[in-house]
Amino acid sequence: MTTKLDSPAVGIDLGTTYSCVGVWQNDRVEIIANDQGNRTTPSYVGFTDSERLIGDAAKNQVAMNPHNTVFDAKRLIGRRFDDDVVQADMKHWSFTVVNKNSKPLFQVEFKGETKTFTPEEFSSMILTKMKETAEAYLGTKVNHAVVTVPAYFNDSQRQATKDAGAIAGLNVLRIINEPTAAAIAYGLDKKAEAGEKNVLIFDLGGGTFDVSLLTIEDGIFEVKATAGDTHLGAEDFDNRLVNHFVQEFKRKHKKDLSGKARPRRLRTACERAKRTLSSSAQTSIEIDSLFEGIDFYTSITRARFEELCADLFRSTLDPVEKVLRDAKMAKNEVHEIVLVGGSTRIPRIQKLVSDFFNGKEPNKSINPDEAVAYGAAVQAAILAGDQSEKVQDLLLLDVAPLSLGIETAGGVMTPLIKRNTTIPAKKSETFSTYADNQPGVLIQVYEGERARTKDNNLLGKFELTGIPPAPPRVPQIEVSFDVGADGILNVSAVDKSTNRSNKITITNDKGRLSKEEIERMVAEAEKYKKEDEEAASRIQAKNGLESYAYNLRNTLNDDKVAGKMDAADKETLNKAIDETISWLDGNQEGAKDEYEHKQKELEGVANPIMTKLYSAAGGAPGGMPGGFDPSGAPPPAADTTGPTIEEVD
């Protein structure tokens, strides 16, 4: 039985390039727009000398601040620094990634200091932004969330995402797979339809790719098989375009743009061109002074773009074949193909999928950018104990994406839970010792599909000691694997003769954050949030002073006022305004109380003069804001029925 939570639970799609948040309200999902009015938020964080920017504000200044604007954190989360994919990605990034204990960290200059952040911390900043977006819309604190991950994320990547939620101050109710969330978005309103439906979710996003095959019947969503590539998406298509134009620039101008200093503006132009080519056959790129004062004007056709990415596009069909094979299903047994993720707007991708299924048209009934957050919001409502009829009987049965097992003698991988096993799942097997009088056993836990453990991914290990002396193969050691609904694994081992046991939650010791590190990062996240709020109020105070000074100046320049003001008063006030504006020019990074103090000083000069002027004139002169409020706002109108704002042509 689900208990009712103290605050609303939201669904967050934490994407490689864009993130999205939704909430279940009034019997439907509401996708929440951010402070810029956009329903998706760029997964970007920018660091400057004075502030931290998240989302649209960060992406908008990336060309001016490429070395300190970080994105693509999802491509690093839960990975090791020496991973081939991490090393390959680093060639395309303008920011710096450093190695600390085999873990990749982002390095930036922030407020004049060199700072490093883990991918979890960075992701927590995006999650915090989504949390604040939801709080602004709901008008209440948000403490609980369902966060989505690619179906093919491994155990350490899932754990790291959960840690990011904790750093953001969120209770992560559950980690769910993106294609499964999208399936909920597709199938929620189809619960009433009779019969079983086989639905293939084809989810190609900014940096990851998943395919899941589900059976939907009477509100039960059962995943039959899943496959994918956690390193394939729009970013890779952008990289192909960037490389193409770097070569073209080199041919035309004999200048090499490659390397760390590759202009960010070219990448932004390539991203825009790629989007345009989804609806146009050709597009042009025009960048003034791209490199060493050289303007770069060129064009590209859709056919050329498709040729540049042909192998990447074709590779999306491999996981489709794999899920059909694993689910033992023929192509013609798939009733619906649902496209999810912005990259599925590419016509070539749509055609490849359609051709693969013998001309069957994919279903485009759901918004590819919002479907995952939509499904996560529904799951959040269920876990939060929402009583709505629409979500009451909905049941999700997901699968383990990779086989989980232990190493046995000779480095052999012995799976306990095979891939595509429905989760939650529990499986136990009995093992024994290999040598005479062996006092203990080392349980090494792996995930992967290869026969030898050295070719698979080591998740963690622990020892079971104190086994009584005995010949080999006599002691009985029961190893149990327990995979929760999050896809996160717990392993225990017990010696049946002594009942001595040991267990671990797989924490991937090499890569996972410790409890202490998470607590430290939570405190730091709070500190950065406080600094962001202080920066916002400082800017507000600066803007308030600036607009007050300029409003005063405009008043003095008004002919109707100038003729009625004493010359000495006018000179005094003009001098005070000039001094304030001059002080502002030299104090752009002042403290909030400095701006407030300066405004009080200026008010001290202006208020007596303006009061004297208005008293002599018997009220505010025509066309003037009477009373002249320090903020520059007009006073309350005497006639409250009339308009309070006057239109200015």
From Swiss-Prot:
Q: What is this protein called?
A: Heat shock 70 kDa protein
Q: Which family does it belong to?
A: Belongs to the heat shock protein 70 family.
UniProt lists the gene as: HSP70
Q: Is-annotated flag, keyword Nucleotide-binding?
A: yes
Q: Which InterPro entries match?
A: ATPase_NBD (IPR043129), Heat_shock_70_CS (IPR018181), HSP70_C_sf (IPR029048), HSP70_peptide-bd_sf (IPR029047), Hsp_70_fam (IPR013126)
What is the superkingdom listed in this entry's lineage? Answer: Eukaryota
UniProt lists compositionally biased (Low complexity) regions at 638-649
GO MF, any single term: ATP-dependent protein folding chaperone
SUPFAM superfamilies the record matches: Actin-like ATPase domain, Heat shock protein 70kD (HSP70), C-terminal subdomain, Heat shock protein 70kD (HSP70), peptide-binding domain
PROSITE patterns assigned to the protein according to its UniProt record, in alphabetical order: HSP70_1, HSP70_2, HSP70_3
Provide the species name.
Blastocladiella emersonii (Aquatic fungus)
Does the keyword Methyltransferase feature in the UniProt annotation? no
Which keywords does this Swiss-Prot/TrEMBL entry list? ATP-binding, Chaperone, Nucleotide-binding
The ranges of region (Disordered) come to 617-649
Instruction: Report the CDD domains cross-referenced here.
Output: ASKHA_NBD_HSP70_HSPA1 (cd10233)
